[in-house]
Structure formats: structure tokens, C-alpha cells
Amino acid sequence: MTILNKDTLAIIMIGTTHVIDMGGKSAFIHYETGTRAHMLLPDGTRFHGLWTLQDDGYKVEWQDGPTGAWKLDHTPGAIDYVDATGTVRGRISRIDFGDPERLAA
């Protein structure tokens, strides 16, 4: 288990879209810039908000939605999203460059 640090997160997050497997359903998070993010949940709910990198994770504040603190945990062959309680909430199934899901639109 390796929690990814700020420098690594900046490389794999800014300007990309993470496709996250949430138990057989996919969520999409597009990190448009170093401060703006957009999310589409499996049930169709969309959020737009502000995020900031931390030394060992990031924080996000969704407009009209939740605020959260997250870490990305790397193990060989996988990167998991871990919430503030230490619970794994999803696994990255792929990372796309840009915004192919048009979440920022």
C-alpha cells in the first residue's frame, strides 16, 4: 500500500478524467484544472466544484453537494480511492486524457 503524494497526484489528475469502478458501475471525475473538477456518479448525478491538492491526497468541495478528503492508494496493478475514514470507495479502471465524457460542458 502506497498513498500517492502531491507531485504524483498532480501528474495523474490535472487535465485527466478518472473512470472509477464502484462495484460494477462507473463514476467519472474530470480534473479540468488544478482547482476545478466535475463528477458524474453512476446514478446520473453531476457535481461541479473546487479541489485542492494536499501533501498526501486532495480535498474537494462540490457546489450543492458534499465536501470530502480523499487519498489515492497504489498497490501493484491498482489505484484505489480512499475516503477520510480509510475506506476504499472505488478503483480506477482507466485514466483518460482530457474530458471525453464532456463533464465540464
Q: What residue spans do the PLM features occupy?
A:
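Lipid interaction determinants
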Residues: 1-50, 54-105
